[in-house]
Swiss-Prot record:
GO terms for cellular component: cytoplasm. Its cofactor is dipyrromethane. GO terms for biological process: protoporphyrinogen IX biosynthetic process. Pathway: Porphyrin-containing compound metabolism; protoporphyrin-IX biosynthesis; coproporphyrinogen-III from 5-aminolevulinate: step 2/4. The modification S-(dipyrrolylmethanemethyl)cysteine is found at residue 244. InterPro entries: HemC, Porphobilin_deaminase_cofac_BS, Porphobilin_deaminase_N, Porphobilinogen_deaminase_C, Porphobilinogen_deaminase_C_sf. It holds the Pfam family Porphobil_deamC. This is Porphobilinogen deaminase. Tetrapolymerization of the monopyrrole PBG into the hydroxymethylbilane pre-uroporphyrinogen in several discrete steps. It is an enzyme of class 2 (transferase). Gene3D superfamilies: Periplasmic binding protein-like II (3.40.190.10), Porphobilinogen deaminase, C-terminal domain (3.30.160.40). It comes from Listeria innocua serovar 6a (strain ATCC BAA-680 / CLIP 11262).
Length: 309
């Protein structure tokens, strides 16, 4: 095993926090190894004036990092799983998926303290078509406006740009220590109201398939239950050929030997939401079955229409 491992990470505070957390976990098992983070700027980081759904494409936050991995500039990379395309670059694999943080979305309110207290016509900040579609299904009176930037920037914009509320991933707030901030008015959004993104709350540690020593090292922090649930979600995403320009959601839970998976596809304004769920022993099988059911209900038409806009 090499004495020094180079870890690829995006430059954002959240990405660096996540990478340092992974290094800390690996250090517990491999105290003799030194780790160094190499910061990499991605296309998604550079484009801040356009919503990601309009940029389109896949891998907006991972392509440059994957290239560095393929070029052997880095030894492994730490990603937010929800940013990782369902098909990886040739020669690369997910070496480990650590235990998942909360998969939920979270309201951060400006003045009120609960969703029910938001007035008619409230302005909600999110650039996620998935969040917008599900929220508008529940409250079509809401005005959804895009908001970009890191967590700190979005929290500043909540007040500076007079949003009534913004929606963030609870996992990001947790990792950055914001859940302990008593000045924030937070409310979890249940999966019944807003089904999470595929892989939300989980990390993906990507490495070269041929680098067996790195693969073995990463396996020491893999969390089996999280890996099984994420497998169902990603099989579903791959079958639908989903990306950030489509309101797609998928969330799996494991109880005993069985996995429960629910998937969703909708149009941009939430007027059409297709949902299906399955329980079974094989995560890949139920993820595929739910995707097939949604396709048979017309999900392919919704996806084609959104891609042609």
């Amino acid at each position: 095993m090499k004495r020094k491992i180079i870890v690829g990470s995006r430059r954002s505070k959240l990405a660096l926090t996540q990478s340092n957390w992974v290094i800390k976990k690996l250090k517990e098992n491999y105290p003799e190894i030194d780790f160094e983070i190499k910061e990499i700027v991605t296309k998604g980081d550079r484009i801040l004036d356009v919503t990601l759904s309009k940029v389109g494409g896949k891998g907006l936050f991972v392509s440059e990092v994957e290239q560095a991995l393929s070029d052997e500039v880095i030894d492994f990379a730490v990603h937010s799983m929800k940013d990782v395309p369902s098909s990886l670059k040739d020669g690369l694999v997910i070496g480990a998926i650590p235990k998942r943080e909360s998969p939920l979305d979270c309201f951060v309110f400006n003045e009120v303290s609960t969703l029910d207290d938001l007035p008619k016509g409230a302005v909600i900040g999110t650039s996620s078509l998935r969040r917008a579609a599900q929220l508008l299904k529940h409250r079509p009176d809401f005005v959804v406006k895009p908001i970009r930037g890191n967590i700190d920037t979005r929290l500043q914009k909540l007040h500076a740009e007079n949003f009534d509320a913004i929606i963030l991933a609870k996992a990001g707030l947790a990792r950055m220590g914001w859940l302990e901030n008593t000045s924030l008015k937070l409310e979890d959004i249940s999966p019944e109201l807003c089904l999470p993104a595929v892989g939300q709350g989980a990390l993906a540690i990507e490495c070269r398939e041929t680098d067996l020593q790195i693969c073995d090292m990463l396996a020491s922090i893999h969390h089996e239950e999280t890996g099984i649930c994420v497998e169902a979600e990603r099989v579903f995403l791959k079958k639908l050929n989903g990306g950030c320009e489509i309101p797609i959601a998928g969330f799996a839970t494991k109880t005993g030997d069985s996995v429960h998976f629910k998937g969703l596809v909708g149009n941009a304004d939430g007027s059409i939401i297709l949902e299906s769920e399955r329980t079974g022993a094989s995560p890949a099988e139920i993820g595929n079955q739910v995707a097939e059911e949604l396709l048979s209900e017309g999900a392919d038409t919704i996806i084609k229409e959104l891609r042609n806009i």
